């Protein structure tokens, strides 16, 4: 099975941490279901590789504010990727998604609604704005459930359980602006 994990990769440590933690959680799920024959590939949201997409058996969006309606224009990439997945009948799962709606317009909101209507979209979980996602998916059969951000599992992914309480570690995972 060829699994593709898509995430936003840039200089924001939080987005990278989301992908790393999501992949770790996915590996636990695969192990718990005794699935051993798989390959995990990764793709940056903004570096679309058509060959990688069409060779995938399933596509996961790792989480974060990818349903962004802001200046980052994530919806344009989600649109292109899910159109390809729809054309090739590749199931897509959105995991622990967020909505960054700083500059939301009717046009961008309509585009997200259209994306969620695609047949390739099989599941959506959200880390925030559950009611807004329910509104966007109202014309679909999708069930929207809340989960924590994958980065919440970083203490287990990085084995922070043995750190002394006298030594603290701080991680900046919030985008400025």
Give the location of each predicted region.
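Active-site anion-handling motifs in enzyme catalytic cores
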Residues: 1-177
């Amino acid at each position: 099975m060829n699994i593709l994990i898509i995430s936003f990769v840039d200089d924001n440590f939080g987005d990278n941490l989301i992908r790393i933690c999501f992949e770790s959680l996915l590996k636990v799920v695969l192990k718990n279901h005794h699935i051993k024959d798989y390959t995990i590939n990764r793709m940056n949201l903004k570096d679309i590789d058509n060959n990688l997409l069409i060779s995938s058996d399933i596509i996961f969006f790792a989480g974060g504010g990818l349903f962004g309606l802001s200046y980052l224009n994530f919806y344009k990439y989600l649109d292109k990727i899910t159109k390809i997945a729809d054309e090739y009948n590749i199931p897509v799962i959105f995991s622990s998604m967020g909505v960054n709606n700083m500059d939301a317009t009717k046009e961008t909101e309509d585009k997200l609604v259209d994306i969620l209507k695609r047949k390739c979209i099989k599941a959506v979980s959200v880390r925030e704005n559950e009611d807004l996602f329910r509104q966007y998916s109202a014309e679909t059969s999708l069930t929207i459930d809340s989960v924590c951000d994958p980065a919440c599992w970083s203490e287990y992914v990085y084995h922070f359980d043995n750190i002394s309480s006298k030594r603290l570690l701080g991680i900046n995972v919030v985008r400025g602006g």
